[in-house]
Amino acid sequence: SDDLSFKFKNFSQNGKDLSFQGDASVIETGVLQLNKVGNNLPDETGGIARYIAPIHIWNCNTGEVASFITSFSFFMETSANPKAATDGLTFFLAPPDSPLRRAGGYFGLFEDTKDNDSSYQTVAVEFDTIGSPVNFDDPGFPHIGIDVNRVKSINAERWNKRYGLNNVANVEIIYEASSKTLTASLTYPSDQTSISVTSIVDLKEILPEWVSVGFSGGTYIGRQATHEVLNWYFTSNLINTNS
C-alpha cells in the first residue's frame, strides 16, 4: 500500500518539510502564520504552506482512491472589529505545482471567478470568517465550507468564529474513500462547542493522481487578521490491489 503519515507538534523556522508561497511563514513562536498584517501591504494578502512531499491520492492503474485523516489546531488574531475581520483559512489538496492565486477571500487557491473550473483540480475545507454573498456567492455569515474547484462551497455550516489565543480551534478532517465522504469537524475545547460539515466528493474525478496538501490563508486591508496553525497531523492510506 501507499501510505504516508507525518506529524508536526509545532513548526520550525529552519525545518525542511514545508514549502511556502506568498506571505506564509513559520514565526519565532513555532507557529505557522499563513498571512501577514501591517500597514504597507497590498489590499489583499495571503499565503500558502504545503507539505514538501506529494501524496498519492489515487492510482490510475487500479482506480483505488486513498482515505485520509488530518487534524490541526489554529487560532486567529485581529486588531480590527472581529465581526468584520477577514478572510479565513483553508486546508486543501491541489496539484503540487499549483501557483499562489488571488489572495484575500480567494485564499490563494482560486481566481476571481464564481464558475466551477476543473483546471484548478482543488478540494479545500474553508474556514471563512466573513461570508460575502455579493463577492463570493457565499452564505451571508461566517461558515465552514467544502470547496471543489471554486471558492463557493458545495456545502457549508454556520461558524461562530472566535479570535485570540484563548480561542484555539481543533479541526479533524476525514475522507472515507469507499463512501467518497469528506467530513470536517471543528471544536473549541474551551467549551466543547462543535460543528461539522460533510459532502460527497469524488477525489478521483477532481484531483490529479499526486497532490500536495497544506494550508492557505488570506486577509483584506483595514480588516486584517492573522491565521495561525499550531500543529498538524496527516495520514493517508492508498491500497494497491494489484501489488
Curated annotation (Swiss-Prot):
It comes from the Eukaryota. GO terms for molecular function: carbohydrate binding; metal ion binding. PROSITE patterns: LECTIN_LEGUME_ALPHA, LECTIN_LEGUME_BETA. Mn(2+) binds at E126, D128, D138, H143. InterPro entries: ConA-like_dom_sf (IPR013320), L-lectin (IPR016363), Lectin_LegA_CS (IPR000985), Lectin_legB_Mn/Ca_BS (IPR019825), Legume_lectin_dom (IPR001220), Leguminous_Lectin (IPR050258). Belongs to the leguminous lectin family. This is Anti-H(O) lectin 1. The lineage of its organism: Eukaryota, Viridiplantae, Streptophyta, Embryophyta, Tracheophyta.
